[in-house]
Amino acid sequence: MSKPLRLILFDVDGTLADSQGAITGAMAEAFEGAGLNVPPREAILSIVGLSLPLAMRELAPNHDDATIEALVEGYKSSYMLSRQAAGAAHSPLYPGAREALAQLHEVPEYLLGVATGKSQRGLDALIDAHGLNCFVTRQVADHHPSKPHPSMILTAMAETGADPDSTVMIGDTRFDIEMGRAAGVTTIAVPWGYHDAATLGADYLIRDFAELRPLLAEIWKE
């Protein structure tokens, strides 16, 4: 009898890719371009994972819609230009990420996907830059409400036929974990990203990517 399909969803920024410098740099240029004070680094990292309009409203709560729109467009422009200039070095993969994805991709019943606050263009560029052709479902901010709304995960499950008991969400921020919880799936936190993993309330915590495959086997009792 064939094994049930298992869906493994990853956040991108702060989970698979170290885009901290790229994000804070683009955010600084966006705020400077709008004539505003640049938020502290900690504040910028605290909103990683949210859709850009919501993130900007968190960082600039007292400004009008036109200013928020200018910040969003300024960020997009700066981020795209720096990505085009730097290529894969713009958002390098964390140690062990590529190897973990390759190992999981070899398991016939494992389906890999992403659920990210990045745009479709941004995600496609990162995947192309790193040659990551293992994802069968790619959920991005362009087509969904911002995290922690569960829409991304629910859509990924619908696309793949996986049920909540056969799905995990792996991320580094509270938005990832809250999204997973809202979708009724198992959550796994990583400590190398932008929020304190110990405070996220995830079902599981891994210390490095080498722990992921054994943990999944334990979760699904394989």
State the predicted function of each range.
Residues I47, A115-G117, I170:
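Structural motif
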Residues M1-I8, Q120-E222:
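Asp-based, Mg2+/Mn2+-dependent phosphohydrolase catalytic module
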Residues G96-A100, M152-T155:
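Well-ordered alpha-helical segments embedded in enzymatic catalytic cores
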Residues D18, V114-T116, A189:
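Hydrophobic residues in well-ordered beta-strands that form the structural core
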Residues P108-L111, A183-V185:
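A generic structural motif
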Residues L16, A89, L111-L112, A141-D142, ...:
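A generic structural signal for short
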Residues L101-E106, I177-R181:
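Surface-exposed amphipathic alpha-helices with a cationic face
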Residues K3-V12, L16-E99, H105-P108, Q120-R121:
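N-terminal helical cap/lid subdomain that shapes the substrate entry/recognition surface
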